[in-house]
Amino acid sequence: MAKAKFERNKPHVNVGTIGHVDHGKTTLTAAISHVLAKTYGGEAKDFSQIDNAPEERERGITINTSHIEYDTPTRHYAHVDCPGHADYVKNMITGAAQMDGAILVVASTDGPMPQTREHILLSRQVGVPFIIVFMNKCDMVDDAELLELVEMEVRELLSEYDFPGDDLPVIQGSALKALEGEPEWEAKIIELAAALDSYIPEPERDIDKPFLMPIEDVFSISGRGTVVTGRVERGIVRVGDEVEIVGIRATTKTTCTGVEMFRKLLDEGRAGENCGILLRGTKRDDVERGQVLSKPGSINPHTTFESEVYVLSKEEGGRHTPFFKGYRPQFYFRTTDVTGTIELPEGVEMVMPGDNIKMKVTLICPIAMDEGLRFAIREGGRTVGAGVVAKIFA
């Protein structure tokens, strides 16, 4: 088969491996890299390159992550793999590697284990939309009934956390045997790649989403009016569009009468661009940093939500001591700090540095938010935690 020429115009999808320690996540990552490079072209990464994950810092948190890329005939994938359980927790909560879908690796010799459950729960909390299961080490299980039982168990576990356990793809394979080049097991990797292609829908691009820009600064320009500046997070704003100012105070509507970038006037501002937006009839005091400019009706302000939080360890520059209920830190959303109070889950008295925990947060003023929004927890400007909005209450 002729190698397909690598082209950048294929849809780009972000995926990653999750699952219990030693169930074969990194071996599977290497197997996918090898088999797809051999079949469709591209560069193969071996186990040691992936396992030796470089250290990254995301919002001051140290995370070890390996990034590899591979291609199928129709798509280009970026794939993340983490060496340790703590790295997964941090990665998923900070959104350092946003996943459009995850490959849950379960060793068929063990079945679901504690971290299998924890990674599924985390995926649910942080909004990983799709999960595909790879049952690994199937070459070591002779009994077909046993494999069937493990598959049922995994499907039930996924259903428990509101994933469609009965309908999602489960591939039974052996990452190690595929990596060693045995054709029947290589075929299972191709099957997994086909499942990624068909089961995970093409992600919506930022530019196609409704317009939103966090406001970083506000200026008054004599004779022209008020300009707000920031980096457009998603969508497009055009001159003449009606926009809403959301968060901190009551929501107001206004019209974009101008877009400028580097002192040049433009017709529109697009996702990823830093621009200034001129607002009709808006006074300098009507807007402040921390609010967002958005397409009307696309986002609402909220104060109370459930979150999944990672608390920085002392080594990461976090707190040296635990915190208790009644803790009142600042929650940093996009461009601003807002004070909030926390409620810990029943039976939890204190939270130690290095823990991850589910907590209910009530802010003193509303912030424009959707489920999946990331935030930092700060004390006097120092980051002590990272979190994600899992569920909005009010």
From Swiss-Prot:
Chain positions covered by the region annotation G4: 136-139
GO molecular function terms noted in the UniProt entry: GTP binding; GTPase activity; guanosine tetraphosphate binding; translation elongation factor activity
G2: region residues: 60-64
PROSITE patterns: G_TR_1, G_TR_2
One term under GO cellular component: cytosol
Keywords: Cytoplasm, Elongation factor, GTP-binding, Hydrolase, Magnesium, Metal-binding, Nucleotide-binding, Protein biosynthesis
InterPro entries documented for this protein: EF-Tu_GTP-bd (IPR041709), EF-Tu_GTPase (IPR050055), EFTu-like_2 (IPR004161), EFTU_2 (IPR033720), G_TR_CS (IPR031157), P-loop_NTPase (IPR027417), Small_GTP-bd (IPR005225), T_Tr_GTP-bd_dom (IPR000795)
Domain of life (superkingdom): Bacteria
Pfam families in UniProt: GTP_EFTU, GTP_EFTU_D2, GTP_EFTU_D3
Main location: cytoplasm
Residue span, tr-type G domain: 10-204
Region (G1): 19-26
Binding sites annotated in the UniProt record for Mg(2+): T26
Primary enzyme class: hydrolase
Subcellular location: Cytoplasm
EC number(s) per entry: 3.6.5.3
Location of the region described as G5 in the Swiss-Prot/TrEMBL record: 174-176
Transmembrane helix listed as a keyword: no
Gene3D superfamilies in the record: P-loop containing nucleotide triphosphate hydrolases, Translation factors
Binding, GTP: 19-26, 81-85, 136-139
Assembly: Monomer.
Family under the similarity heading: Belongs to the TRAFAC class translation factor GTPase superfamily. Classic translation factor GTPase family. EF-Tu/EF-1A subfamily.
NCBIfam families: EF-Tu, PRK00049.1, PRK12735.1, PRK12736.1, small_GTP
Function statement: GTP hydrolase that promotes the GTP-dependent binding of aminoacyl-tRNA to the A-site of ribosomes during protein biosynthesis.
Name by which UniProt lists this protein: Elongation factor Tu
Organism for this UniProt entry: Shewanella sp. (strain ANA-3)
Gene: tuf1
